[in-house]
């Protein structure tokens, strides 16, 4: 018979919004990441074997990666929103969005036009990847053609990888309508493979 345990909430106290977690089968543990907005270091990684005892093992974003993500140039309460953590083709992968970038501050702070173009072509959506949760983390890989916020990344049984997120509806039937869309993505180049398809429109 499987032993039962008692979980006392909150399992993580303090500011830990938008949690995303995986069961890391290789190491028989839960790995969890949360939002940190404009704070650096950012995207803390926690691990647990039993859902009750948690250990903070690393932060994904250091000062150098924060600069590459343009975090110093976001407005208050901007920055990294709603990370999604997955194992994709054996790598640890985080899909996320940078919100509320101030272009003027970015340019004044030394950001190049090409950096801003890549950022806006991806609407602030990016991938980070690593071979270990302790890092180092590679990226950002800006996802050109991504639309919206709150991305998810998924690998199916055949090894195909899909990017899914919410965006304003292409043909809205009411003000503020959104839709979920999905598109296959190449996990080696982090570029889209084919045309995206709406998966749902909130009807």
Language model: regions and residue ranges:
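Carbohydrate-active catalytic/glycan-binding domains of CAZyme proteins
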Residues: 1-203
């Amino acid at each position: 018979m499987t032993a039962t345990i008692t979980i006392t909430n909150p399992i993580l106290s303090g500011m830990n919004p938008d949690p995303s977690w995986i069961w890391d089968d290789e190491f028989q543990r839960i790995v969890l990441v949360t939002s940190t907005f404009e704070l650096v270091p950012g995207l803390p990684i926690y691990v647990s074997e039993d859902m009750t005892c948690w250990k903070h093992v690393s932060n994904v974003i250091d000062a150098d990666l924060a600069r590459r993500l343009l975090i110093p140039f976001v407005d208050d309460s901007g920055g990294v929103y709603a990370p999604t953590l997955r194992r994709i083709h054996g790598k640890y992968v985080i899909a996320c969005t940078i919100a509320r970038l101030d272009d003027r501050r970015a340019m004044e702070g030394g950001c190049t036009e090409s950096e801003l173009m890549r950022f806006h072509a991806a609407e602030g959506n990016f991938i980070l990847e690593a071979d270990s949760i302790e890092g180092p983390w590679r990226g950002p890989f800006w996802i050109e053609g991504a639309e919206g916020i709150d991305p998810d990344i998924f690998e199916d049984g055949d090894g195909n990888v899909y990017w899914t997120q919410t965006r304003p509806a292409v043909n809205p039937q009411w003000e503020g309508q959104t839709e979920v869309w999905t598109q296959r993505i190449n996990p080696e180049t982090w570029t889209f493979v084919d045309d995206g398809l709406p998966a749902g429109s909130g009807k």
